[in-house]
Amino acid sequence: MEWENHTILVEFFLKGLSGHPRLELLFFVLIFIMYVVILLGNGTLILISILDPHLHTPMYFFLGNLSFLDICYTTTSIPSTLVSFLSERKTISLSGCAVQMFLGLAMGTTECVLLGMMAFDRYVAICNPLRYPIIMSKDAYVPMAAGSWIIGAVNSAVQSVFVVQLPFCRNNIINHFTCEILAVMKLACADISDNEFIMLVATTLFILTPLLLIIVSYTLIIVSIFKISSSEGRSKASSTCSAHLTVVIIFYGTILFMYMKPKSKETLNSDDLDATDKIISMFYGVMTPMMNPLIYSLRNKDVKEAVKHLLNRRFFSK
């Protein structure tokens, strides 16, 4: 009987929007368009940060990493989600679910840390402009970006390994679009208090600590901006931070609402799962990567000029 109750699962069923075929078709079209915008927008930012010598600075190096990160993050989930919208059998193998869970968590953690690094870069640029070339030299900002990726990979590997080792019962229905780690963890028929503790520690270290760094950095930046006597100087200083601050508010506002809101095991796996959670999850997974290049391009003259230069060069080369 114990063996029957602890069946070895080989696949999971992603419920998503099952039972709403019209909504699935609508979401397929919308998400496909958004994914194309994500690839084009973030791909353009990566190209200009590499090809334009004027953008070979720490700020745009971090921005290029952020754009590449957004492409990787969405590619781990959107294609499979689109396929599931058109497929009657919405299943994913255990190994495929583990890979998707690892990549999604790794990219999310990396983005949190990277946004903290970018805030520190803006702090040094505005509050210590004379020492900026020394503090944010290539020997500093390249390891900072690499460290963000390493932290994301290590954190995700540790959490994913602990989750896949859990015993799963017959219930293999994930009431989500993707293999989100918390939704998968709640399917286990074992005590998950250790996993929850590890997740709490990871959340504190890799989500809240970068957020604290961002808050401290921007508090000092605001104080420095108010000390600038000329209105032109204040405007120039604030414009260099407005795009990053907007991205931070959208990213952290969404992620904190998703993961800080208490959820019970019954709520995560019930048929009447709060639709707001799914909408916010979709917003976090698609809208944020799509908006990042738009925000940076609309609020940054250097990016606009670099895009124009790239387009003109391609046009005249033909």
Curated annotation (Swiss-Prot):
Residues 1-25, 76-99, 161-197, 259-277 are extracellular. It holds the Pfam family 7tm_4. Disulfide bonds join 97-189. The keyword Transmembrane helix applies. One of its GO terms (biological process) is detection of chemical stimulus involved in sensory perception of smell. Residues 47-54, 121-139, 218-237, 299-318 are cytoplasmic. Glycans are attached at residue 5. It is found in: Cell membrane. It is a multi-pass membrane protein. Odorant receptor. This is Olfactory receptor 13C2. It comes from Homo sapiens.
